[in-house]
Amino acid sequence: MTASAKEEYGFFGKWWQFAKERFDPFSHSLMISLFIVAHYVVVAVDLGKKFPADFGGEGAWRHFALALGVCAFFFKLRLYDEIKDYEVDCEINRDRPLVRGLVTHKDLYSGIAVCIATEVITFGLLGTAALVAIVFSIAYSLLMYKEFFIGEQ
């Protein structure tokens, strides 16, 4: 990608273009919504409550925080995958955003840091149990990113 093409997108534009290409907003929003609703159903059944839970009123911010945190988690997994697949993409998928220069490795590492911060903040707002759960999830995702530190066979 040329410098003028990078300038054409701008900071937010390049991330929006990346998301459109590699983290389709519609399909991922649907998947994340179903993921969250499934968890709400499990909790409601476990607590013997009816579903759906109260989504309005003063507690609505909690649902928004949860959705934002879960979205950040899944987006972070996409960023990990982009970095891990870079060498293969250079040979096979030359149209990918990282390979063609829409985003850089530094951009993706910065995006990962922002996602982790978003996860910690949003889940922290939801209470200690949620914070502990996301910290374990982040740790596990980092192990996955490093493939459990297993070298190539």
Go through each PLM region and give its residues.
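Catalytic micro-motifs at enzyme active sites that drive phosphoryl/nucleotidyl and oxygen chemistry
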Residues: 83-86, 98-99, 151-152
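Juxtamembrane helix-capping/reentrant segments at transmembrane boundaries
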Residues: 92-105
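Hydrophobic alpha-helical transmembrane segments
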Residues: 1-77, 84-94, 110-145
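Juxtamembrane membrane-interface segments at transmembrane alpha-helix termini
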Residues: 143-153
